[in-house]
Amino acid sequence: MSDNAQLTGLCDRFRGFYPVVIDVETAGFNAKTDALLEIAAITLKMDEQGWLMPDTTLHFHVEPFVGANLQPEALAFNGIDPNDPDRGAVSEYEALHEIFKVVRKGIKASGCNRAIMVAHNANFDHSFMMAAAERASLKRNPFHPFATFDTAALAGLALGQTVLSKACQTAGMDFDSTQAHSALYDTERTAVLFCEIVNRWKRLGGWPLPAAEEV
């Protein structure tokens, strides 16, 4: 058996990166000025046979930072009332501190070197998380500063679809449109979609890579 055929660990699969699925709901499109209102994160794990699956889930409603813009159109779209006391919202610091703590623990346990965000249209989620981490003065950010795995691009390649709901349905997954634009639900669906794309590539023989002499 080649060395490549034995690469079944999470640390081997993504060049030492620890994939963490993220989705955010916000009060606009500008990460510097508009409020982060909700964030969910799902870590991933790999079994002994090299199949990828969801692991730990974290979810927080977030208080708008002082001076944040709250765009009415964005709030109408996601249905979030930032002033609803039943949201149980926490500060950006509290939400990201807890997520980063769990992610750092996962990096260490898996033998990985750094976290990488998995998200649908990842630039949006990445920009808001990074801006919030900067505002919260969180120095030990475990995520890569710019690299991501974007499931919109991956699904376009693997499934011919770039919209999350259509990609999930094409992959044979359920998608409840009434729950869409909840950070928790969208993160759960994105995590399962990413795992399906990675595992489908493995089922098709694309991973582990063949040894050099076999190519």
Swiss-Prot record:
Active-site residues per Swiss-Prot or TrEMBL entry: H181
SUPFAM superfamilies xref list: Ribonuclease H-like
Enzyme superclass (EC): hydrolase
GO molecular function, one term: magnesium ion binding
Gene Ontology BP, a term: tRNA processing
Gene Ontology, cellular component aspect: cytosol
Site entry (Important for substrate binding and specificity), positions: F29, F77, F124, F146
Binding site for Mg(2+) 2: D23, E25, H181, D186
Species per Swiss-Prot/TrEMBL record: Escherichia coli O1:K1 / APEC
Binding site residues for Mg(2+) 1: D23
Family note: Belongs to the RNase T family.
Taxonomic lineage: Bacteria, Pseudomonadati, Pseudomonadota, Gammaproteobacteria, Enterobacterales
Keyword Repeat among UniProt keywords: no
SMART domains given in the database record: EXOIII
Exonuclease domain span: 20-194
Domain of life from the UniProt record: Bacteria
PANTHER family for the chain: DNA POLYMERASE III SUBUNIT EPSILON, RIBONUCLEASE T
Keywords tagged on the record: Exonuclease, Hydrolase, Magnesium, Metal-binding, Nuclease, tRNA processing
Pfam families listed in its UniProt record: RNase_T
Cofactors, names only: Mg(2+)
Gene: rnt
Subunit structure comment from the entry: Homodimer.
UniProt remark on cofactor binding: Binds two Mg(2+) per subunit. The active form of the enzyme binds two Mg(2+) ions in its active site. The first Mg(2+) forms only one salt bridge with the protein.
Protein name: Ribonuclease T
Gene3D superfamilies assigned: Ribonuclease H-like superfamily/Ribonuclease H
